[in-house]
């Protein structure tokens, strides 16, 4: 169980990472350890457990971002900490290469140790995600 000061530090680190992401200066992915366990919950073909930062980035993040005409912009609605877990409620908005918007609601459960994220459980509307993934082809 994390101490109150560790809990608050973790929350502040995650808040700062989302602030940086919103300004295009970094992202929460910078907090991931190399062998992070990233779980996408749902029925999407991409819903599964990824066993490293690189696996997740190569199979999800890079091809997803390659479908965007402009970078994803997060809108954070709340960040909560309990023990070693930081929970983030946020939306992502962007425009795809087809000119149509992408919008989805996300909840990430970030489990932390030593100021780094070692496990993520991600919830979002996988149907919206899949529709976008299928509709928009990635650009190199």
Describe the residue ranges of each PLM region.
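Short, mixed-charge, low-aromatic patches
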Residues: 12-21, 45-50, 63-67, 89-90
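Hydrophobic pocket/interface hotspot
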Residues: 14, 27-32, 36, 56, ...
């Amino acid at each position: 169980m994390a101490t109150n000061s560790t809990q608050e530090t973790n929350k502040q680190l995650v808040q700062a990472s989302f602030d940086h992401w919103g300004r295009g200066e970094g992202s929460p992915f910078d907090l991931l350890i190399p062998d992070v366990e990233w779980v996408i919950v749902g029925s999407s073909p991409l819903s599964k457990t990824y066993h490293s930062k690189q696996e997740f980035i190569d199979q999800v993040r890079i091809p997803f971002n390659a479908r965007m005409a402009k970078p994803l912009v997060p809108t954070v609605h709340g960040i909560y900490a309990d023990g070693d877990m930081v929970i983030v409620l946020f939306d992502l908005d962007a425009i795809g290469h087809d000119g149509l918007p992408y919008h989805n609601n996300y909840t990430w459960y970030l489990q932390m140790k030593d100021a780094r994220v070692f496990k993520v459980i991600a919830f979002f509307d996988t149907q919206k995600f899949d529709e976008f993934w299928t509709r928009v082809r990635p650009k190199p």
